[in-house]
Amino acid sequence: MAKKAPAAPAFEQALSELEQIVVRLESGDLPLEEALSEFERGIRLARQGQQTLQQAEQRVKILLSDDQDAPLSPFNAEQE
């Protein structure tokens, strides 16, 4: 059986990890390669968080729309 790719961390978990990365980077104690690796991870987490927030915002807009008969459908961030 093929292994599945690891699931993206939950928003709150990703945010917590991102905050820890920022603290480590701001300390200035990391070697260059490790700092770059942490920075890359932080960028991925920030982008994932932004996408999650955009999807949540779209869901809220749909739920609060005036059209009670409007169908709810999955939001695809790539459509915008």
Swiss-Prot record:
| Record EC number | 3.1.11.6
Biological process (GO) annotations held by this record are: DNA catabolic process
User: Transmembrane region positions?
Assistant: none
List UniProt keywords, sorted A-Z.
Answer: Cytoplasm, Exonuclease, Hydrolase, Nuclease
First-listed, main subcellular location of the protein, grouped into a coarse class:
cytoplasm
Note the superkingdom of the native organism. Bacteria
**Leader sequence segment:** none
Location of the protein in the cell: Cytoplasm
Q: Which InterPro entries match?
A: Exonuc_VII_S, Exonuc_VII_ssu_sf
Q: Which PANTHER family does the record cross-reference, listed alphabetically?
A: EXODEOXYRIBONUCLEASE 7 SMALL SUBUNIT (PTHR34137:SF1)
The UniProt function text for this chain reads: Bidirectionally degrades single-stranded DNA into large acid-insoluble oligonucleotides, which are then degraded further into small acid-soluble oligonucleotides.
Give the protein's recorded name. Exodeoxyribonuclease 7 small subunit
Native source species: Edwardsiella ictaluri (strain 93-146)
